[in-house]
Amino acid sequence: MDSDETGFEHSGLWVSVLAGLLLGACQAHPIPDSSPLLQFGGQVRQRYLYTDDAQQTEAHLEIREDGTVGGAADQSPESLLQLKALKPGVIQILGVKTSRFLCQRPDGALYGSLHFDPEACSFRELLLEDGYNVYQSEAHGLPLHLPGNKSPHRDPAPRGPARFLPLPGLPPALPEPPGILAPQPPDVGSSDPLSMVGPSQGRSPSYAS
């Protein structure tokens, strides 16, 4: 009788262990969000950063060959930028033509550098509901502004964060392959109007000049 009771207890113990294992295996786990709208590290985009904020100007941000940063009314090779995500919400901005990184000094002044400095050249990208973005220095927390027109007769007005509209950068047009000529109309006066025979083959002496 004692052996039967012992076997029953062991069976009950195994049933409890199996039930616990099955319960753990059947528990639901959250699925990671795979939305393409999230800013993953390594994501690269080519954009023009256009601003029409209250700066008395409408311009595209340019990173120039001499390292200066300014605005251009029209899109130009210097205003085509490469935005690369360093981590969620933080990007680096590179001039495609000049290979200079957009950087910001502690006083807010912008410049283009051939070398990437994580402290000076990393920007937080804040997405607004109207499609515009605001960029802030990750290290200093200063908003990204285009340099304004300096006037000796008035003090610069205080400015809020500048809004930039990222416009898609179109890839350069591919050149047409050489050697492709338009087809010529058939020569109805020839013995070979469709040019199926070489120039020196199958030609009647009657057509020789």
From Swiss-Prot:
Pfam families given in the database record:
FGF
Q: Does the keyword Secreted apply?
A: yes
Pro residues composition-biased segments: 168-186
Which compartments is it annotated to reside in?
Answer: Secreted
Question: Per the UniProt entry, what is one GO biological process?
Answer: signal transduction
Q: Does the keyword Acetylation apply?
A: no
Q: Which domain of life is it from?
A: Eukaryota
Q: Name one GO cellular component term.
A: extracellular region
Instruction: Cite the CDD domains for this sequence.
Output: beta-trefoil_FGF21
The Gene Ontology terms for molecular function here are: fibroblast growth factor receptor binding; growth factor activity
Q: Where is this region: Disordered?
A: 143-209
- Keywords tagged on the record: Growth factor, Secreted, Signal
Leader sequence range is: 1-28
Query: PANTHER family in the record, alphabetically?
Result: FIBROBLAST GROWTH FACTOR
Give the family from UniProt: Belongs to the heparin-binding growth factors family.
Function of the molecule: Stimulates glucose uptake in differentiated adipocytes via the induction of glucose transporter SLC2A1/GLUT1 expression (but not SLC2A4/GLUT4 expression). Activity requires the presence of KLB. Regulates systemic glucose homeostasis and insulin sensitivity.
Quaternary structure (record) = Interacts (via C-terminus) with KLB; this interaction is direct. Interacts with FGFR4.
Record-given protein name: Fibroblast growth factor 21
Give the originating organism. Homo sapiens
- The gene that this protein is the product of is FGF21
